[in-house]
């Protein structure tokens, strides 16, 4: 008994003590006033869950009406946002069509410029003293066939210093 925890002893004293008759009746313990030499018998309390009758039906109706309200709100929000997005989608389609035309022109100019780059020295459009830093740089300074047009188309519609050809060169 000396090795028991003090809180366990306190609880045992409160339940088994002389002033705990009311507590024993509330908890459901059997009053055990027995003499010396006999064993005490305690019955542990039983906790029973009880169901409330009548309120359950109203609670499920409240939940059901809340779910209907939530579904209606979501549906109306989706309908409004779909009609609002229609203008944005039309704007994106128009911009995509414009970009496609510009990109087709760029693709055609780049293929011609790639052909010209292969033969710039042979055609004489990019000679030695002028092409010291490369024909790309020469095309920015003076007109080189196909390459200058390719650079101009590549930078069309963009900020002058944000163009891919102008990373290290400022006009």
UniProtKB/Swiss-Prot annotation:
Biological process (GO), any one: photosynthesis
Domain of life: Eukaryota
Compartment(s): Plastid, Chloroplast thylakoid membrane
Keyword Signal listed: no
Membrane topology field: Peripheral membrane protein
Cellular-component GO terms for this entry: chloroplast thylakoid membrane; photosystem I
Gene3D superfamilies in alphabetical order: Chlorophyll A-B binding protein
Residue(s) carrying N-acetylglycine: 87
Main subcellular localisation: plastid
Transit peptide location on this chain: 1-49, 50-86
Keywords recorded for this protein, A-Z: Acetylation, Chloroplast, Membrane, Photosynthesis, Photosystem I, Plastid, Thylakoid, Transit peptide
Pfam families: PsaN
Extra facts: The N-terminal Edman sequence is 2 amino acids down-stream of the N-acetylated terminal peptide identified by mass spectrometry. This suggests an additional processing.
Record note on quaternary structure: Interacts with GRF5, GRF7, GRF9 and GRF10. The transit peptide is the site of PSAN that associates with 14-3-3.
Protein family according to the UniProt entry: Belongs to the psaN family.
Function: May function in mediating the binding of the antenna complexes to the PSI reaction center and core antenna. Plays an important role in docking plastocyanin to the PSI complex. Does not bind pigments.
Record's protein name: Photosystem I reaction center subunit N, chloroplastic
